[in-house]
Design a protein with these regions (language model features):
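Intrinsically disordered, low-complexity glycine/proline-rich and charged
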Residues: 122-162, 237-248
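Intrinsically disordered, low-complexity linkers and terminal tails enriched in Pro/Gly
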Residues: 2-17, 156-180
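N-terminal regulatory modules in eukaryotic regulatory proteins
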Residues: 137, 162, 166-255
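Solvent-exposed alpha-helical segments within well-ordered globular domains of core cellular machineries
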Residues: 35-39, 66, 70, 94, ...
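Helical mechanochemical/support elements of P-loop NTPase systems and associated helical scaffolds
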Residues: 22, 30-33, 60-64, 88-92, ...
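Short, ordered loop/turn segments at secondary-structure junctions
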Residues: 26, 80-81, 113, 136-137, ...
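Domain-level signal for Mg2+-assisted phosphodiester chemistry and nucleotide/NA-binding surfaces
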Residues: 2-95, 100-101, 130
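Acidic beta-strand-to-loop metal/phosphate-binding motif
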Residues: 53, 106-113, 120, 124, ...
Length: 255
């Protein structure tokens, strides 16, 4: 085994799971996606803080009420003090800052489609913590780009709850469509180039970490649950499975 590979595996084995704080803007996202969001966050760590913000006297949040207890989500009441003003945003920001200063979380997840939270994301990032974003496809680009990654919740909805147009979005994008996405191809090739060893091979986990640190990319938005599956679909990289098939290495097929 290559010394660098052994060191990387040792680092991964002693790394503690992330403690994630999930804050939900119930006014701006569908309750139907919460199961998918929690499943996705399980890839990154343990969601030990789950706060759902909104005015729970509002009939529009009735769907969320049924999701609270089954998923151990704590409702955070915020009354609408002034008609036409959304007090939930301010309360959610205060909640996030309290959690940030507590030092008891390692990452944040924001479930919202409101770009007003972009400054909050940037502030959390300044403290060295990642922010996982979840929102609708209408979410403004500044918020999407600030998160790493950002997942469109339409891709996380149960199939039986999805609209016909959503089911199309969730289909895996094929080889030609993926290759036609210049931004995606550039991102993948750059990530491999920046994380590869002298022989050109890069550990997929390191590639994924580079992408996470430099973009809002998520394989789910392309119809794939895992980065490795998307990489295979592009057919742009040579692939080697090492350590009895447990470690995936990729190399730019042009080299």
């Amino acid at each position: 085994m290559h010394p660098l590979e052994l060191l990387y595996q040792l680092e991964m084995s002693v790394t503690k799971p992330n403690r994630i704080a999930l804050l939900i803007d119930c006014d701006n996202v569908s309750h139907n996606a919460i199961e998918g969001v929690l499943d996705e966050l399980a890839k990154y760590g343990t969601v030990n803080v789950r706060h759902a913000h909104g005015d729970w006297n509002s009939p529009s949040l009735s769907g969320w009420i049924d999701r609270l207890h089954p998923h151990a989500i704590r409702p955070m009441q915020q009354f609408a003090y002034t008609k036409g003003k959304n007090a939930t945003d301010a309360a959610m920001i205060i909640d996030a800052m309290d959690l940030l200063y507590s030092g008891n979380v390692d990452a944040f997840a924001l479930m919202t489609s409101d770009s007003d939270f972009t400054p909050l994301v940037l502030r959390i990032l300044e403290s060295g913590l990642p922010v996982y974003g979840f929102g609708q496809r209408k979410t403004p680009k500044p918020f999407v780009d600030a998160c790493s990654p950002f997942v469109y919740i339409e891709n996380l909805l149960p199939l039986e709850d999805s609209k016909p147009c959503v089911s199309v979005i969730r289909e895996n994008k094929g080889r030609n469509e993926l290759r036609g996405d210049a931004a995606l191809v550039r991102l993948l090739r750059t990530a491999v180039d920046q994380t590869s060893e002298d022989d050109g091979w890069a550990h997929l986990s390191r590639v994924g970490q580079y992408i996470s640190n430099n973009s809002s990319f998520s394989a789910i938005n392309y119809g794939y649950k895992k980065l490795g599956d998307l990489v295979r679909a592009t057919e742009l990289f040579d692939i080697e499975m090492r350590n009895d098939g447990k470690a995936m290495y990729i190399k730019d097929a042009r080299k």
